[in-house]
Amino acid sequence: LVSDIDNTVKYLYGLSDGEKVETVLMEYKHGNSICISTQVGCKMGCKFCASTKAGFVRNLEPSEMLLQIYESERDSGRKINHVVLMGIGEPLDNSDNVVKFLRLLSAKDDMSLRHVSVSTCGLVNRIYELADLKLGITLSVSLHAPTNELRSSIMPINDRFRIEELMEACKYYFNTTGRRISYEFALIDGVNDNRQSADALLKLLKGQNCHVNLIPVNEIKEGVFKRSASVEKYKQMLIDGGLN
């Protein structure tokens, strides 16, 4: 499936057991980026995410992660410069295979892992383990809410690992690797897109060397959440408060 707007290509890859995963190839001025899946389905239960609706089936093997890159390069004729583990699944819930994949990617493709981003919804114990490996990757944390009450209402993982624990793990990651954290924040209309949310986020991230990536939430047919129309307004509130 190819976008008429920006040459983005979405692939649906069939696996040997009949399961399927999605991969997205994106073209930017600085090169080509690919977003790959790490699991078939997902256990995490984030209420705004389509990947979790059908439940969890299995982890992907390292070879199945590499396949998404190789086949997308072959089909598109484009050289991939940046890899993002942010497709279907929670990468750190499949951490052993993800680390094997990263080592294979670095060894076989001579790709610097500094051009790889790994996403997590907040598996705190795995963040510490990943930090100690010092792979040089960017850690992208799906935050989406600045308080425990709000985050727990949309992300069940927050009942297991509270925001305070997550922040400590992120600080450890930065201090251990020197790589700043990227926080993903999907703005949901009437949920997390107001001044109160922005002020709480500024307070939460104060003093951190980090980046905040604001995106309007993807509306899904199974969900009730709507895209916020206040992305630029919210962004300006963060900039005025000293975040970027």
Provide a role label for each language-model segment:
Residues 1-36, 68-72, 76-77:
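N-terminal [4Fe-4S]-dependent radical SAM core
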Residues 2-9, 235-244:
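A C-terminal junction/extension of Radical SAM enzymes
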Residues 3, 37-38, 51, 119, ...:
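Short linear Ser/Thr-Pro motifs
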Residues 17, 27-29, 40, 89, ...:
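Short, flexible active-site-adjacent loop segments at beta-strand->alpha-helix junctions, enriched
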Residues 27-64:
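Canonical Radical SAM [4Fe-4S] cluster-binding loop centered on the CxxxCxxC motif
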Residues 53-82:
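Conserved alpha-helical substructure of the radical SAM core
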Residues 73-82, 87-241:
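Conserved AdoMet/S-adenosylmethionine-binding subsite of the radical SAM
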